[in-house]
Amino acid sequence: MANYQNLLVVIDPSQDDQPALRRAVYIVQRNGGRIKAFLPIYDLSYEMTTLLSPEEGSTMRKGVTSQRTAWLKQQAYYYLEAGIDIEIKVVWHNRPYEAIIQEVITGNHDLLLKMTHKHDKLGSLIFTPLDWQLLRKCPCPVWMVKDQIWPDQGSVVVAVNLSNEESYHHELNLKLVKETQELANQVMKNPEIHLVSAYPVAPLNIAIELPDFNPSVYNHALRGQHLIAMKELRQTFCIDEKYTHIHEGLPESVIPQMCDEMNAGIIVLGILGRTGLSAAFLGNTAEHVIDHLKCDILTIKPDGFECPIKAAKE
C-alpha cells in the first residue's frame, strides 16, 4: 500500500530553495508521517593532506559536517516552526548514492524524494549520474521533483506496458495503478488519473524483406491486443475509458507528449533497475522515457527487486 509515512529527502547543497523538501511537507501535511532531510557531503581535500594528523582531519570533517547541519536546519526552520516532524542528518561519505540508499535501508524509508533540474532551452529535466544511480538501485519508490510549482489542475499519468512478452509487466502494471490511486486519493482532491501506453508499429522496410508480411494487418492486431489489455487493466481499478490512452509510436516519444497535452503534474513509471551488461545491451524503456519528461516523476520497482547496495555496517 502506498501509504508513505517515512520519507527521506535528499538535500541539494547548491540550492537555498529545496523543492523536494517542500513536496515532502506537502505529502506529510495531507497524509501524515515524518521526514528525514538527508545530506551526504565529501571533500577530497580533507582526505589528501599530509600536513594533518588523523585526529586533526577528523576534527575538520566534523566541523564541516556541523556547518552543513546548521545550514540545513535553517533551510527547514519554517517547517519545523510549523510543527512538521523533520529529522536533520548530515553524513560524510565519498559515494553519495551509496550513503542515500544505505540510509533508505537502515531507516526503513518508504519514499525517497530528490530535486532535479530543468534544461533551460529544452524544458526537459536534467538527470545527473547520482539521479540515475538512485533510480536504478534504490529499493523504495523514488520521487524526482522538478524545480517548479505544481500545475493548476495537474493530472496524474501512469505509464503502463501492455505487451504480452513477460508476465512481470502485468504484475508491475497492477502495482503501479494500485499505488498511484492510493497515493493520489490521500494527497490530492479529486485526482484525475490517466493510463498511457504506446506500441511500436512494424518497420516500413519489413514488407520488402518479407513480401508476405502485411504491416497494416500486424499493426491493427497489435493495437487490438493493447486495447484488450488496457480494458482489462482499467476495469480492475474502475477507471473510466476516457482516462485511458493508447498511441502508436515509441514510448520515449508518445508518453512525454501525452504528459504535456494532459498538463501532468507527475508521471508514475515502473523501472526494472537493470545494471551492468543487461542495462548496456538491453536498455530500459523507462529510462528512455525519463530523459524526455518535463514533470515530476515517481518510479516504482517490481516486487522482488534485489537492491545491489547493502546496509551500512554499524
From Swiss-Prot:
Function: Required for resistance to DNA-damaging agents.
Stored Pfam families: Usp
Record-given protein name: Universal stress protein E
Organism of derivation: Photorhabdus laumondii subsp. laumondii (strain DSM 15139 / CIP 105565 / TT01) (Photorhabdus luminescens subsp. laumondii)
Top-level taxonomic group: Bacteria
Chief place of localization: cytoplasm
CDD domains linked: USP-E_repeat1, USP-E_repeat2
Name of the encoding gene: uspE
Residues spanning the signal sequence: none
GO cellular component: cytoplasm
Localization: Cytoplasm
Keywords assigned: Cytoplasm
Protein family (similarity comment): Belongs to the universal stress protein A family.
